[in-house]
Amino acid sequence: MQTGFENADDHRFIQSVAKKRGIRFSRPGNGICHQVHLERFGKPGKTLIGSDSHTPTGGGIGMLAMGAGGLDVAVAMGGGTYYITMPKIVNVHLTGALQPYVAAKDVILEVLRIMTVKGGVGKIIEYTGDGVKTLSVPERATITNMGAELGATTSVFPSDDVTKAFLKAQGREEDWSELKADDDAVYDETIEINLSELEPMAAMPHMPDRVKKVKDIGEIKVDQVCIGSCTNSSLMDMLKVAAILKGKTVCPSVSLSIAPGSKQVLNMLALNGGLSDMISAGARILESACGPCIGMGQSPNSAGVSLRTFNRNFLGRSGTKDAGIYLVSPEVAAVSALTGKLTDPRTLGAPLNILMPESFIVNDNMVEMPASPEDADKVEVLYGPNIKPFPTTEKMPESIQAKAILKVGDDITTDHIMPAGAKILPYRSNIPHLSQFCFAVCDETFAERAKAEGKGFIIGGANYGQGSSREHAALVPLYLGIKAVITKSFARIHCANLINAGILPLNFANADDYDKIDQGDELALNNIRTAILNNETVYLENITKGEKYELKYDLSQRQKDIIVDGGLLNYTKENI
């Protein structure tokens, strides 16, 4: 969705950098990166890091695929090392098989219901059991994709004959290798799920773990249905939707939009007639892109109800703050678009008979190869006027004194910290302009107050920074002078991004101390540099109230060095 020159300039900039630096470039319109990677690049047994939290989509093909901050990925691409703390391993043991109109989306919604959005932090989710072989690669990828909403490091399925058949259909059979757990594998935790017992589910506003059965939520009126995203935009999902819509008409009170996940999916839909069935039914076909999932278009009406096959339903993420967003499967979405109300798709009766092709259309003409080493130096990197320098910081001072510039509660997402949407995303290369939107969902005065103060602390609750891996949620607070974020607990990727930005992440040793601090209190971290380097206890002094609170920090020696150096950029310059 390009309403000005900014996105076009960004695309041109990235394209020129990729060409110069030896990187393949998937051009705009080729599809959502996770869907394209699954189809054309993913290999079982390989490790993948990507600067998007839904990189674990690759776990559906047997990859160790992890979301990370952009700086972490850039350092790894430049020859550095990517570090993670060894996670615990959770075995989700699947038995049985999905019943008609029950989908892979319902599997991960059930896992979210059990584990919650905090339950996967510091864990890898491994799927095992006889039920695994009943799931296709796209279905597995749907499940691993939304493992991000658990806060998990990643999720992974074995690589088996189902994986081999998928790769063969993509013309990549030589990329297959078997991957399975050892017979004597030991897990930290086991969750049992019988696929045969699952029913159509929905996550209610405004959190992916607020899960109920569709039949228990009831027949609420629906204003909008959006089908697509990196979670549910595969050919299999699209064929199911087309079959449900075939010969029918979308309810007059419903706006239905559909975004196939890749050019390959769109091509095949066009050739087999599925696209025509969608259009004839009244669907609005969107570009193969993230689109409405990140708030780029298709915002619901005021106080509207929108069913989406997406992965997140955070407050305001859709672009309409008072809209009610429900996360559902493509089957629930398509049937509800016809009825105009939330509908259990099992009411259709006869099961869908979807035949997947034995081979996919392979056309990689939208993947641009880099220049040869001989020609790389001749490639000019193209900048636009909206592309501004990366914010930097100085080394950590011995002590820090500043106000609690903002106090927020539990489950603050990176969408709260740095919102997305059509109004804001075009400025992601312009941190000074972007900064005016920081925390606007929570407090529209934050950016102005932070600029006026020049420095400050943020006080947060539990699971601070969950959701997207967007490093702008750390870079913009850095630009606004935030020196430390003090919380009950952090989400993994955001905590790493804060460290990379040179912002100190600290936790209350006693969670009750959170309640003792008010926004505007004058706070101090005395001798913080020495304490961090010497692994000493850190105390937060509340100058306003005359109190002290013990704080904790979970930092490796490398992370301490990064913080003290003023962030990963400074650290990398000095050490690589």
Q: Which ranges hold each PLM region?
A:
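Fe-S-dependent hydro-lyases/dehydratases of central metabolism
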Residues: 1-576
